């Protein structure tokens, strides 16, 4: 598996994955207004890494590098459970220059378990229009 910087040719796949993964992963939210173009606005100015294997895109992560903040990490449903998320997370963590941070919706228990398995620790909670989120930190060894 290769983790590489995104290219413009990745945009259709990333848009589709972002839309569908949010609909599947966040069923408690109203997705009726979500569009493919949301990916463009929601990752503007971020570093995007793509997981790829044998020419097939499997997932992506987007990072606000100046803040050491993991904004998004999504894996295609047919690629889940194969280490894609872990590989993306490892690549993201390697880019952090200090303590990394992310916010995960409290209802997204699957993602919270994933991050905990990879050494992320809960630092607090906050409220967002989508609901309560958990603030997680990753301290570089």
Question: Residue spans of the language-model regions?
Answer:
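Conserved GNAT acetyl-CoA-binding A-motif
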Residues: 95-107
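Acetyl-CoA-dependent GNAT
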Residues: 5-78, 89-91, 95, 126-128
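Short glycine/proline-centered loop/turn elements that form peptide/ligand docking sites
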Residues: 85, 89, 107-111, 128-134
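Conserved acetyl-CoA-binding loop of GNAT-fold acetyltransferases
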Residues: 116-125
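Conserved N-terminal entry element of GNAT/NAT acetyltransferase domains
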Residues: 1-9, 140-141
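Active-site beta-strand termini and strand-to-loop segments that position acidic
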Residues: 52-54, 138-141
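Conserved acetyl-CoA-binding loop-helix of GNAT-fold acetyltransferases
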Residues: 81-94, 113, 117
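Active-site acidic-Proline motif in GNAT/NAT acetyltransferases
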Residues: 76-82, 106-107
